[in-house]
Amino acid sequence: VGVLSSCASGPGPRERMATQYERYSRFAGDAVASFPFFTMQNWVLLGQYRLAVYTKVNEAWLLEVSPPCSDLEFAQAIALSSSVSRVSAKFDHVLVGRDRCPIKEIRPVDVRAMKRERKLEQGSE
Protein backbone atom coordinates (compact mmCIF):
# COMPACT_ATOMS: atom_id res chain seq x y z
CA VAL A 1 0.00 0.00 0.00
CA GLY A 2 1.49 3.27 -1.03
CA VAL A 3 0.71 6.52 0.67
CA LEU A 4 0.66 9.68 -1.34
CA SER A 5 0.55 12.89 0.56
CA SER A 6 0.44 16.37 -0.67
CA CYS A 7 0.70 19.60 1.17
CA ALA A 8 -0.06 23.02 -0.09
CA SER A 9 2.96 25.17 0.17
CA GLY A 10 2.67 28.88 0.07
CA PRO A 11 5.44 31.39 -0.07
CA GLY A 12 8.03 31.16 2.68
CA PRO A 13 8.92 33.99 5.06
CA ARG A 14 11.62 35.44 2.79
CA GLU A 15 9.28 35.50 -0.21
CA ARG A 16 6.55 37.17 1.86
CA MET A 17 9.03 39.78 3.09
CA ALA A 18 10.23 40.41 -0.48
CA THR A 19 6.63 40.90 -1.64
CA GLN A 20 5.91 43.25 1.27
CA TYR A 21 9.12 45.18 0.58
CA GLU A 22 8.12 45.64 -3.07
CA ARG A 23 4.77 47.09 -1.95
CA TYR A 24 6.34 49.47 0.58
CA SER A 25 9.05 50.46 -1.90
CA ARG A 26 6.46 51.35 -4.56
CA PHE A 27 4.87 53.82 -2.15
CA ALA A 28 8.11 55.19 -0.72
CA GLY A 29 9.37 58.60 -1.71
CA ASP A 30 12.91 59.78 -2.22
CA ALA A 31 15.45 59.37 0.56
CA VAL A 32 15.36 61.97 3.34
CA ALA A 33 18.00 62.86 5.91
CA SER A 34 15.78 62.39 8.97
CA PHE A 35 12.24 62.15 10.35
CA PRO A 36 10.52 63.39 13.52
CA PHE A 37 10.35 60.69 16.17
CA PHE A 38 8.36 60.75 19.37
CA THR A 39 6.99 57.20 19.54
CA MET A 40 6.90 54.03 17.49
CA GLN A 41 3.43 52.59 16.86
CA ASN A 42 4.53 49.47 14.99
CA TRP A 43 7.24 48.04 12.77
CA VAL A 44 7.33 45.52 9.93
CA LEU A 45 10.34 43.43 8.96
CA LEU A 46 10.84 43.59 5.19
CA GLY A 47 14.12 41.74 4.77
CA GLN A 48 17.49 41.10 6.35
CA TYR A 49 18.38 44.80 6.31
CA ARG A 50 15.01 46.51 5.68
CA LEU A 51 12.05 47.47 7.82
CA ALA A 52 9.13 49.87 7.94
CA VAL A 53 8.62 51.89 11.10
CA TYR A 54 5.21 53.40 11.87
CA THR A 55 5.36 56.58 13.93
CA LYS A 56 1.63 57.26 13.53
CA VAL A 57 -1.28 55.24 12.16
CA ASN A 58 -0.81 56.70 8.66
CA GLU A 59 2.87 57.64 8.87
CA ALA A 60 5.61 55.15 8.09
CA TRP A 61 9.26 55.25 7.15
CA LEU A 62 11.11 52.67 5.08
CA LEU A 63 14.53 52.10 6.66
CA GLU A 64 17.52 50.32 5.26
CA VAL A 65 20.28 49.46 7.71
CA SER A 66 23.91 48.60 7.10
CA PRO A 67 25.33 45.21 8.00
CA PRO A 68 26.15 43.62 10.29
CA CYS A 69 22.66 43.38 11.71
CA SER A 70 22.28 39.66 12.37
CA ASP A 71 19.54 39.87 15.03
CA LEU A 72 17.03 41.90 12.99
CA GLU A 73 15.52 38.91 11.16
CA PHE A 74 14.67 37.24 14.47
CA ALA A 75 13.69 40.30 16.52
CA GLN A 76 10.56 40.38 18.65
CA ALA A 77 11.13 44.04 19.49
CA ILE A 78 13.30 46.89 18.28
CA ALA A 79 14.14 50.42 19.35
CA LEU A 80 15.48 53.44 17.50
CA SER A 81 18.16 55.82 18.64
CA SER A 82 17.29 59.48 18.14
CA SER A 83 18.62 62.92 18.83
CA VAL A 84 16.43 65.93 19.63
CA SER A 85 13.31 63.90 18.66
CA ARG A 86 14.64 63.08 15.18
CA VAL A 87 15.99 59.88 13.66
CA SER A 88 18.75 60.56 11.15
CA ALA A 89 20.28 58.42 8.43
CA LYS A 90 24.01 57.80 8.77
CA PHE A 91 23.87 58.84 12.45
CA ASP A 92 21.16 56.87 14.28
CA HIS A 93 20.66 53.13 14.71
CA VAL A 94 18.04 50.42 14.88
CA LEU A 95 18.66 48.71 18.21
CA VAL A 96 17.88 45.01 18.27
CA GLY A 97 19.31 42.49 20.70
CA ARG A 98 23.01 43.25 20.97
CA ASP A 99 23.11 44.84 17.52
CA ARG A 100 23.29 48.55 16.81
CA CYS A 101 22.38 48.60 13.14
CA PRO A 102 23.38 51.88 11.45
CA ILE A 103 20.53 53.45 9.47
CA LYS A 104 21.76 53.77 5.90
CA GLU A 105 18.65 55.23 4.24
CA ILE A 106 15.24 56.65 5.22
CA ARG A 107 12.31 56.99 2.80
CA PRO A 108 8.82 58.26 3.68
CA VAL A 109 5.97 55.86 2.83
CA ASP A 110 2.62 57.08 1.49
CA VAL A 111 0.60 54.83 3.80
CA ARG A 112 -2.79 56.17 2.72
CA ALA A 113 -2.08 55.40 -0.95
CA MET A 114 -0.82 51.95 0.00
CA LYS A 115 -4.03 51.26 1.96
CA ARG A 116 -6.18 52.52 -0.94
CA GLU A 117 -4.45 50.12 -3.33
CA ARG A 118 -4.95 47.22 -0.93
CA LYS A 119 -8.68 48.01 -0.62
CA LEU A 120 -9.01 48.13 -4.41
CA GLU A 121 -7.23 44.79 -4.72
CA GLN A 122 -9.48 43.21 -2.08
CA GLY A 123 -12.58 44.63 -3.78
CA SER A 124 -11.67 43.05 -7.10
CA GLU A 125 -11.18 39.55 -5.67
Model-derived segments and spans:
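Helix-rich interaction surfaces within compact, conserved domain-sized segments
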Residues: S66-E125
